Curated annotation (Swiss-Prot):
Function (record text): Catalyzes the base-exchange of a guanine (G) residue with the queuine precursor 7-aminomethyl-7-deazaguanine (PreQ1) at position 34 (anticodon wobble position) in tRNAs with GU(N) anticodons (tRNA-Asp, -Asn, -His and -Tyr). Catalysis occurs through a double-displacement mechanism. The nucleophile active site attacks the C1' of nucleotide 34 to detach the guanine base from the RNA, forming a covalent enzyme-RNA intermediate. The proton acceptor active site deprotonates the incoming PreQ1, allowing a nucleophilic attack on the C1' of the ribose to form the product.
The protein's name in its UniProt record: Queuine tRNA-ribosyltransferase
Gene name for this UniProt entry: tgt
Key words, A-Z: Glycosyltransferase, Metal-binding, Queuosine biosynthesis, Transferase, tRNA processing, Zinc
Gene Ontology, cellular component aspect: cytosol
Single Gene Ontology MF annotation: metal ion binding
A GO biological process held by the record: tRNA wobble guanine modification
Length: 382
């Protein structure tokens, strides 16, 4: 993988990731949003439908794909690309966040994490080395190191110990990645909770090891939005400018805008797909809750400014009807729209950076939403 930085507008960065795959050279224009395909599928969508929304890269889930279908079946198909028939780039998370989510079902040690398989109750073990081996079998174009996702709230001492162990795991991940002869990209993950000095130590340690990109982890786990913004403003300027920056698990449309304002290049989140299945649809001026009875006889398109298949062909009344009847097509049409909304938003962001009018775009974006523009502070990184 190669990262090319073309232009900046304030802190916002316009570039691309370039991948050499067996099928040819693929570019991912950044800032980019990655739809989440937890089990090797973006829920309800074929790969062709996902691509039609504008997506150029997907996220797969190492933890869940390891439990089902497992490495052996993946190897029989070739890799995850062959298994799910998506031959463009794939990023896989390491499984660290899913293990964190297990709560009392898991025990963290220096060696790794012992936990109870949520599917069959078996006791199993996941380590940095094992995560690298699973992601190697998945054929991930971007591999994430195995880390501990520091919970919120956490004391300074807990966050420090967690971050230090994640650094040791980062080195073990890097060593095993190299031993496997993996020619793809490996990203480090910056931890440290809401404590700036810990984030700085984490980043410095990761840079000393050397990675192809750097993710900001451990945010969007319950901390106030102001803390997320503060950490991003503090740490992003310190990340090497020639490496991509990835904010993990974020988020709402305004979170994407705020991340780009602070220098982030890559995002992923289940929000557009999960919200679609729950009837929450993103439109130019906010959200349409399609289950609201006021849409029962609304013959207008969901979003007149949207060019997706759903908006070009169907009315709000039809989407309301499908949802009311529990029809699978309703969830699919909603998902097509929400994914396209996110990709259109990213395309608008990229164009605004190219035109060096990103600050104006931010003002216009919040004006459409009827919301004030959040403050942007200049962090003191001395």
């Amino acid at each position: 993988m190669k990262y090319e930085l073309d232009k900046t507008s304030g802190n916002a960065r316009r570039g691309r990731l370039v991948f050499e795959r067996p099928q040819g050279t693929f570019s991912v224009e950044t800032p980019a949003f990655m739809p989440v395909g937890t089990y090797g599928t973006v829920k309800g969508m074929t790969p062709e439908e996902v691509r039609a929304t504008g997506a150029e890269i997907l996220l797969g889930n190492t933890f869940h794909l390891w439990l089902r279908p497992g490495q052996e079946i993946m190897r029989k198909h070739g890799d995850l690309h062959d298994f799910m028939q998506w031959h463009r780039p794939i990023l896989t998370d390491s499984g660290g966040f899913q293990v964190f989510s297990l709560g009392k079902l898991r025990k963290i040690t220096e060696e790794g994490v012992k936990f109870q398989n949520p599917i069959n109750g078996e006791r199993i073990f996941l380590s940095p080395e094992k995560s690298m081996e699973i992601q190697y079998d998945l054929g991930s174009d971007i591999v994430m190191i195995f880390d501990e996702c520091t919970p919120y709230p956490a004391t300074f001492d807990y966050a420090k110990k967690s971050m230090e162990m994640s650094l040791r795991w980062a080195k073990r991940s890097h060593d095993r990645f190299d031993e496997l002869g993996n020619k793809n990209a490996l990203f480090g993950i910056i931890q440290g909770g809401v404590f700036e000095e810990l984030r700085k130590v984490s980043l410095e340690g990761l840079v000393n090891i050397g990675f192809d990109g750097y993710a900001v982890g451990g945010l969007a786990v319950g901390e106030p939005k102001e803390d997320m913004h503060r950490i991003l403003e503090y740490i992003c300027p310190q990340i090497p400018a020639d490496k991509p920056r990835y904010l993990m698990g974020v988020g709402k449309p305004e979170d994407l805008v705020e991340g780009v304002r602070r220098g982030i290049d890559m995002f992923d989140c289940v929000m557009p797909t999960r919200n679609a299945r729950n009837g929450h649809l993103f439109v130019t001026d906010g959200i349409v809750k399609i289950r609201n009875a006021k849409y029962r006889d609304d013959t207008s398109p969901l979003d007149p400014e949207c060019d997706c298949y759903t908006c070009k062909n169907y009315t709000k009344a039809y989407l309301y009807h499908l949802d009311k009847c529990g029809e699978i097509l309703g969830a699919r049409l909603n998902t097509i729209h929400n994914l396209r909304y996110y990709q259109r938003l990213m395309a608008e962001i990229r164009q605004a950076i190219e035109d060096d009018r990103f600050d104006d775009f931010v003002v216009e974006f919040y004006a459409r939403m009827g919301k004030p523009v959040p403050p942007l502070q200049l962090a003191d990184n001395s």
